[in-house]
């Protein structure tokens, strides 16, 4: 049904089905990388059905044309360029050489290309994020598998241990970029979605051959609200003219017929909706990226779905150290995704495991420092000869030095006893 680009359609649909169940998605990501391309593929299917199984164009033919000629005119005017002349305007050679309407034949292919453009940023992100220490998709998949195999508490503890090992690798690494590799890739993904929306607008402008990027607002006002489609609409004209020549008795006769573009009425509604949807996606994605950038840079604690100060052995100072030095940017980003996918309760259980390891490490470090700095009792020596037999004393078989523990030396009268 889709002709030579049918395999592209099937491959794109398969990719969207795989992406539907991806864990490493927030709502805005799903709108960009799954919902919008899915709608574009559905639009492609609807327009293709009209082109191949319906009657996309219907032309008024002269009376002398038979039924076979009618079919020929319809097909010819669909595959050849048509042009738009407003009602009440004389059809001149200048009008014939004006703006031709030829985009409608390529709409299904262009829609598939636009859907692929929406999917591309996610697949580029998926290619690079696998090399990061904190693998968002891999970590979430690990937690999902643990919840299926183990008890929830055990799964959260196991996942906390896995995260802690990753965070320890980051802290022990000499490369300071390891702490926010996943965060940088995440922002590049968001930026890719924004750039894609801009490129989509540029593509629409050139594909539809319009004068500016605000064509959607002007079209909606002038055509839909004012009802001047027959006079002013040259973007999605309902009625177009088509020129063709017929050879009869060795001579060519040119005919000009008026055609109703039934397909254009469908394309118009779809593209107007898609135009304003692009604006909505652009605004939402940009606002979401700015909001998350502010949180991850200046209010990282707001990304943690629990109050760390209420945890055992935690206080504001330790909470700040835990977020800044231990979780870092990538750890906070991962916990944000865990909260979005598995809920605040499971995330709080995972954080409990991380905090337990954090406090144990701090306590062990502080105990080691205390043992090195504490005061040890001074050791003194004293001569003790009262109990030494004279024969052993003479042979010096017994040491004359005895260690005595205490804060001070023994009294002087005990040290000065005669030997």
From Swiss-Prot:
GO terms for molecular function: gap junction channel activity; gap junction hemi-channel activity. InterPro entries: Innexin. Pfam families: Innexin. GO terms for biological process: monoatomic ion transmembrane transport. The keyword Transmembrane applies. The keyword Membrane applies. Keywords: Cell junction, Cell membrane, Gap junction, Ion channel, Ion transport, Membrane, Transmembrane, Transmembrane helix, Transport. GO terms for cellular component: gap junction; plasma membrane. The chain crosses the membrane at residues 33-53, 108-128, 184-204, 270-290. It is a multi-pass membrane protein. It comes from the Eukaryota. It is found in: Cell membrane; Cell junction, Gap junction. PANTHER family: INNEXIN, INNEXIN-2. Structural component of the gap junctions. Belongs to the pannexin family. This is Innexin-2.
């Amino acid at each position: 049904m889709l002709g030579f680009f049918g395999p592209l359609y099937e491959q794109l649909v398969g990719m969207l089905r795989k992406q539907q169940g991806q864990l490493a998605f927030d709502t805005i990501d799903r709108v960009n990388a799954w919902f919008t391309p899915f709608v574009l593929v559905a639009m492609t299917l609807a327009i293709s059905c009209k082109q191949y199984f319906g009657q996309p164009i219907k032309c008024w033919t002269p009376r002398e044309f038979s039924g076979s000629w009618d079919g020929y005119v319809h097909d010819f005017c669909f595959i050849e360029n048509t042009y738009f002349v407003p009602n009440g305007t004389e059809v001149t050679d200048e009008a014939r050489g004006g703006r031709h309407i030829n985009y409608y034949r390529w709409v299904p292919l262009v829609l598939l290309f636009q859907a692929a453009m929406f999917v591309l940023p996610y697949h580029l992100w998926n290619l690079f994020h696998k090399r990061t220490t904190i693998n968002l998709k891999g970590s979430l998949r690990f937690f999902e598998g643990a919840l299926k195999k183990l008890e929830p508490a055990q799964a959260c503890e196991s996942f906390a241990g896995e995260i802690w090992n990753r965070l320890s690798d980051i802290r022990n690494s000499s490369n300071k970029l390891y702490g926010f590799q996943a965060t940088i890739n995440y922002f590049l993904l968001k930026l890719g979605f924004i750039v894609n929306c801009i490129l989509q607008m540029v593509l629409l402008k050139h594909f539809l051959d319009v004068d500016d990027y605000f064509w959607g607002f002007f079209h909606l006002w002038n055509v839909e609200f004012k009802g001047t489609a027959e006079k002013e609409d040259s973007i999605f004209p309902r009625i177009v003219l088509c020129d063709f020549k017929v050879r009869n008795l060795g001579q060519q006769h040119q005919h000009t017929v008026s055609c109703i573009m039934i397909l254009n009425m469908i394309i118009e509604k779809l593209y107007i909706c898609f135009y304003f949807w692009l604006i909505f996606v652009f605004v939402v994605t940009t606002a979401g990226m700015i909001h998350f950038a502010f949180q991850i840079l200046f209010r990282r604690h707001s990304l943690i779905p629990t109050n760390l100060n209420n945890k055992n052995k935690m206080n504001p100072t330790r909470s700040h150290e835990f977020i800044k030095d231990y979780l870092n940017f990538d750890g906070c980003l991962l916990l944000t995704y865990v909260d979005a996918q598995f809920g605040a309760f499971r995330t709080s259980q995972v954080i409990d495991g991380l905090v337990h390891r954090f406090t144990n490490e701090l306590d062990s470090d502080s105990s080691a420092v205390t043992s090195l700095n504490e005061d040890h009792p001074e050791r003194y020596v004293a001569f003790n000869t009262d109990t030494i037999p004279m024969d052993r004393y003479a042979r010096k078989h017994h040491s004359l030095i005895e260690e005595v523990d205490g804060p001070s030396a023994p009294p002087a009268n005990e040290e000065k006893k005669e030997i």
